[in-house]
Amino acid sequence: MFNKILKFTQKKTGYLYNNSLFLQNIDKLIFASIMLVFLTSTVMSSDVIGFIALITVFLTIVKVLTKPNETLSCKSFELWLLAYFMLVIVSLAGSTLFHLSLKGFFKTFTYMAFYFSLVQYLKNNRNKIPYLLGAIGLCVSFEAITGFLQNFSHVEEISGWQDVSGLNPEEVMTRVYGTLKPYNPNLLGGYFVAGIPSLYGLAAYFLADKKYKFAIGGVLLALFSTLTLFLTGCRGSYIGMMVVFCGMFAVSAKYLWQNYKAIYLSIVGGVVAFATTAILLVSSLRARVLSIFAMRQDSSNSFRFNVYHSSVDMFKDNWLLGIGVGNQNFREIYGLYMKTGFDALSAYNIFLEIAVESGLFALIAFVGFLITLIKNSVKFILKSADTKSVIFAATALISICAVCIHGLVDTVFFRPQIQFVFWTMVAIARTIVVE
């Protein structure tokens, strides 16, 4: 039905499209706006980034309505995503704080619409995928350099980011936060988890294309960004980075295990040995890693446990439709459940947050979307003989999985800087795996 409507509008606007310089170059404008979303995400506020993303959406709608032969299609995993979005709308309608939930809904709409725009753009522009990954990699590298310099200038904490009670002075880490707004090392860590796979993916792409200088440059930037990730002190990003390395080792085994087994095992062993040595020798890093297992002995862990407990109580009382999306809406209702002194903007777990905000069935839909996408991507990676396509699919899949694992213990998943990278990776996976 939608494609029939599009065909009708395209027919009516055919003369306009053929004689409009703007419409003839609309793909170039969409590409420029997508790039601008990534570039501005490093220094601009959430509102500015969202506004630029909406420009991308507007241009895409104009393109779909006017460009001949443009069609819409919905793949299996997108049915889950569509169900999730519809349930978010139902949750919005039933929210007791509608005006606050509406703000959160507009953010969700922007992310979903940006994903739709990327899918439509990449249908006929698959050759632009390296440029999208390059833009993300460039931004990640910029943040890595900034964070590295902040470490040597010993920037002060803007708020209490680390429990220093019981730590010796040499065990206190200077936590870097880059230029992402609002300034927060956990946000920077999450951004690295989402974006660093693009650098490793580009390095592999250039290696497959026999552009060895670019491949070496990609590897160096990826390693440098990985180093800066550990300087954020974000323990969730440490776990996410472990997922990234496990994913890369698993995919590379497809090409190296049979003929280069010794080299493969040496690389894996070297990475594990280097990471272990760094944890043992660098006292501040060791203290951060060990604090993961300190349970309630660490104030940050204890805070999260209290938030989880209160969020589960919120879910029990609002399990069907949730309370409505948005951190402002969450904070208002969370106040009725929270333990004194433990205020929070979110549930510190993306799956628990979705359940609290939009209900049980929205959570099922979102998890169904992830499982279907991951399943299709893994099948493609195992069976495809196209090395470059496997690299792109693996890059997207590793980023998606790492972000979701990090999101089990943190709240930064819902920040626009990470959201736009996440949905870009989903669009790339969709384009490579499904199309």
Predicted regions located by residue number:
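Flexible juxtamembrane loops connecting transmembrane helices in multi-pass membrane enzymes
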Residues: 170-178, 262, 278-309, 333
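Transmembrane signal-anchor hairpin modules in multi-pass inner-membrane enzymes, especially those
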Residues: 1-103, 120-134, 203-216, 259-266, ...
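Transmembrane alpha-helices of multi-pass inner-membrane enzymes
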Residues: 55-61, 242-246, 394-435
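Hydrophobic transmembrane alpha-helices and their immediate junctions
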Residues: 250-253, 358-402
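Alpha-helical transmembrane segments of multi-pass inner-membrane proteins
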Residues: 32-38, 56-59, 89-90, 113, ...
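Membrane-interface micro-motifs in multi-pass membrane enzymes
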Residues: 43-52, 103-104, 179-195, 236-237, ...
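Long extracytoplasmic/lumenal interhelical loops at the membrane interface
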Residues: 295-309, 313, 317, 321-358
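Juxtamembrane membrane-water interface segments that cap and precede transmembrane helices
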Residues: 34-35, 167-182, 305-306, 339-353
